[in-house]
Amino acid sequence: MERHITKEVQIGNRWIGGNHPIAIQSMTNTKTEDVAATVAQIKQLTKAGCEIIRCAVPTQEAAAALTEIKKQITIPLVADIHFDYRLAIAAMEHGADKIRINPGNIGSRERVKAVVDVAKERRIPIRVGVNSGSLEKGLVEKYHGVTAEGIVESAMDKVKLIEDMGYDNLVISIKSSDVMMCVKAHELIAKQTDHPLHVGITEAGTLISGNIKSAIGLGLILNQGIGDTILSLIHI
């Protein structure tokens, strides 16, 4: 199996891309504002094999909590941001090693640029995330439905937006609950970019069926040498 070689990206004390090992990422389900509970869960996940942790940052209080959380953990922390660009900026100011955004739901170009400017200043990578469930109406119409091609075009449009702002310290994430659509999308995007790819299958169905879908999808994608970090919902 020949690996799809991508750019190297540093996330805290961890490197992904290039010839670095595929990093296992998981996510917390605590309220990030609850520092004690969040740290305890991250430590359990670390012990179980997690190498990068993602925390939701839905409020300014959650962003502020990252400072103390970071002091107590040993793995890189990714801040998951939706809608409010100010939370992305606050998360970076409070120590996030990477941020996950969808530029399409952050707002205007000016707001995206405000986030990019802080990331550039602090050399913090941005994970550009696109989900089939929130694909732009224009792309759904163009491809006559939600398709792998539409997902890839959406992701690459957002990558270009940030690159045009003079920043290319990026990781790309494309997801769908349709396993084969997700596999095809990864095959397509790997031919179009050398940015590292974060691989995960959107959760759907019961815990068991969701795990089966995830295992099949991840296996098919990784078997083609595609992927630099994977999302694993580790059970502790």
Language model features: what each stretch is:
Residues 1-2:
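Intrinsically disordered, low-complexity regulatory segments in eukaryotic proteins
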Residues 209-231:
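Active-site loop ensemble at the mouth of alpha/beta enzyme cores that anchors a bound cofactor
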Residues 79:
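Active-site flanking residues adjacent to catalytic metal/cofactor-binding acidic residues
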